[in-house]
Every structure is written in structure tokens, then in C-alpha cells.
């Protein structure tokens, strides 16, 4: 068990973001659950350490009279990752990050997303680049949602983002990894963590992302909209771990023709 733990994930194979090490490579969102109790149960079952929160849609102290997500996802147990979901302009995204910093007592780690279209929820990459530059200058540690364009991903890294998060497919679509070679190219060229963000639908999608060499996966809808969210959270945890181990192990080469698994020399009755 100790060997598997060291090689396949955990303390011997940490995910490091903005100088902090995490044992889990599964990051989860908090939207779309039926209630806060289900949110807590799913997050716990996933084994996640980083939990993302939509500041514009979730109460984390903005409304003292209402239940707060932080009551069930306490910041002393989890790293809270405020995100700018629902922002379509640079100004809104930057303002939302600054609000999160105020609400969370100087919190620096944020997930930036600037959307360009309400139908696809694809990122507006021009606005994303501009917002990233502003936030990095303002002292934020920026994890950034982007498309699967390797050139844009590299530019965001050069700006100073601490992690690049390309979509695998449209947010909430569950379509899986649509352009694996684009994701692979981003991974191969990156010097910061690459985490697939959006598009995962089931455990096999998460495993594929990790097998490509991604450092982690962030998901919400795939767990929250499952028939049994808590059970799906467990499945995703195992898929992330299995995919990471497979990547570290190194898959066999693909071959066009068969290759016998048993030696031909020394056959009985030969």
C-alpha cells in the first residue's frame, strides 16, 4: 500500500499550485446540488481539498441572514477557490475577484473565467488575457479557464497565471475530451499545472484527462447532476487516481497488428 500511495498519488506525488501542495488532484464545484447537505457529502466523498465557489451566485458572507456555503465547506478544512462564473466583461471579473478577497480576508487564489457567449459558455479569450494581466498585477494567484488553444494557454502562463485550465468540452455538456491532442499539446508545453475544466461527464472522461498528463481535473455538473451524486463523487476520485497512476506508469505503445503475449520459443509439442 505504501508503494502505491507514493507512486500513484498522495503525499509522494503532490499537486502544487501557487506554492501549496495538495494530495488530491480532483477539484470540485458547489453548484447544482439539491441542498447544502448533499454538497457537503459529495465534496467529502470526492476527497477534494480545493473547492470552487461562484461568488456571484453563492452566499459566503455577502448575505449574513442566509445560510452560508462556508458552514458546510469550512475554509479551515478546504482551500476555497472563488470563481468569476457569470462574468462577461473584464470589469465584472476583476470586481468579483476583489470582492472575494475582501470576503475571505485577503484570499489570493482565484479562478478566472470571462465568458463570451451564454449558449456555449466558451471563454472570451481576449477579455480573459486582459483580466489575467490586471489580476496578476493586483497580487492574485490566478487559475484561469480558457479554451483548448495551446497558444492562448502558453500566453496565459507567460502573463503569470499559476494554473491553466482548458475546457475539454462546453461547460455542463458532459461530452468528454473532445480534442485530446490539443490538451496533450498544452500539457507538453506548460511549466505550470494544467487542469481540465469543463466537459467531463463520467469517470472514464476524468481518467482520460489524467492519462494525457493533466495535473488535475475540476468538475461540478458531472457529479451534481448524476443520479447519485455522492456515489459519482467516489467514482471520480478513483478515476483521477487510476488515470494518474496510468500516466506515471507509461502506457504500452499502440500497434497496428497483434503481438503475442506468450513467447514462441520452447513450445511444448513443437
From Swiss-Prot:
Keyword tags: Cytoplasm, Schiff base, Thiamine biosynthesis, Transferase
Subcellular location: Cytoplasm
Pathway assigned in UniProt: Cofactor biosynthesis; thiamine diphosphate biosynthesis
Annotated GO biological process: thiamine diphosphate biosynthetic process
Statement: the UniProt record of this protein carries the keyword ATP-binding: no
Catalytic activity, reaction form: [ThiS sulfur-carrier protein]-C-terminal-Gly-aminoethanethioate + 2-iminoacetate + 1-deoxy-D-xylulose 5-phosphate = [ThiS sulfur-carrier protein]-C-terminal Gly-Gly + 2-[(2R,5Z)-2-carboxy-4-methylthiazol-5(2H)-ylidene]ethyl phosphate + 2 H2O + H(+)
EC number: 2.8.1.10
Pfam families (alphabetical): ThiG
Gene Ontology cellular component annotations, sorted alphabetically: cytoplasm
InterPro entries: Aldolase_TIM, Thiazole_synthase_ThiG, ThiG
Residues reported in the UniProt entry to bind 1-deoxy-D-xylulose 5-phosphate: 172, 198-199, 220-221
Chief location of this protein within or outside the cell: cytoplasm
Coiled-coil parts of chain: none
Active site annotation, chain numbering: 111
GO MF terms, alphabetically ordered: thiazole synthase activity
Organism superkingdom: Bacteria
Task performed by this protein: Catalyzes the rearrangement of 1-deoxy-D-xylulose 5-phosphate (DXP) to produce the thiazole phosphate moiety of thiamine. Sulfur is provided by the thiocarboxylate moiety of the carrier protein ThiS. In vitro, sulfur can be provided by H(2)S.
Subunit structure: Homotetramer. Forms heterodimers with either ThiH or ThiS.
Family statement drawn from the similarity comment of this UniProt entry: Belongs to the ThiG family.
Name this protein carries in UniProt: Thiazole synthase
Amino acid at each position: 500500500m505504501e508503494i502505491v500511495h507514493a507512486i500513484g498519488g498522495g503525499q509522494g506525488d503532490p499537486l502544487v499550485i501557487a506554492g501549496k501542495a495538495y494530495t488530491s488532484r480532483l477539484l470540485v464545484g458547489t453548484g447544482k446540488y439539491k441542498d447544502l447537505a448533499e454538497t457537503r457529502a459529495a465534496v467529502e466523498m470526492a476527497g477534494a481539498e480545493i473547492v470552487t465557489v461562484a461568488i456571484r451566485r453563492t452566499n459566503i458572507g455577502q448575505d449574513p441572514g442566509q445560510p452560508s456555503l462556508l458552514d458546510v465547506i469550512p475554509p479551515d478544512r478546504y482551500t476555497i477557490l472563488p470563481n468569476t462564473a457569470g462574468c462577461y466583461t473584464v470589469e465584472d471579473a476583476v470586481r468579483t475577484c476583489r470582492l472575494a478577497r475582501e470576503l475571505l480576508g485577503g484570499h489570493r487564489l482565484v479562478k478566472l473565467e470571462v465568458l463570451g457567449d451564454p449558449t456555449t459558455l466558451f471563454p472570451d479569450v481576449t477579455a480573459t488575457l486582459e483580466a489575467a494581466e490586471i489580476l496578476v498585477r493586483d497580487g492574485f494567484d490566478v487559475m484561469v479557464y480558457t479554451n483548448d488553444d495551446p497558444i492562448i494557454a502558453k500566453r496565459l502562463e507567460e502573463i503569470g497565471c499559476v494554473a491553466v485550465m482548458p475546457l475539454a468540452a462546453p461547460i455542463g455538456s458532459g461530452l468528454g475530451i473532445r480534442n485530446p491532442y490539443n490538451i496533450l499539446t498544452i500539457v507538453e508545453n506548460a511549466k505550470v499545472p494544467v487542469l481540465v475544466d469543463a466537459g467531463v461527464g463520467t469517470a472514464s472522461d476524468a481518467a482520460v484527462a489524467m492519462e494525457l498528463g493533466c495535473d488535475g481535473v475540476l468538475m461540478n455538473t458531472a457529479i451534481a447532476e448524476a443520479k447519485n451524486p455522492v456515489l459519482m463523487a467516489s467514482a471520480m476520485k478513483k478515476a483521477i487516481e487510476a488515470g494518474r497512476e496510468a500516466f506515471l506508469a507509461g502506457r504500452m505503445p499502440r500497434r497496428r497488428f497483434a503481438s503475442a503475449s506468450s513467447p514462441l520459443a520452447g513450445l511444448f509439442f513443437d
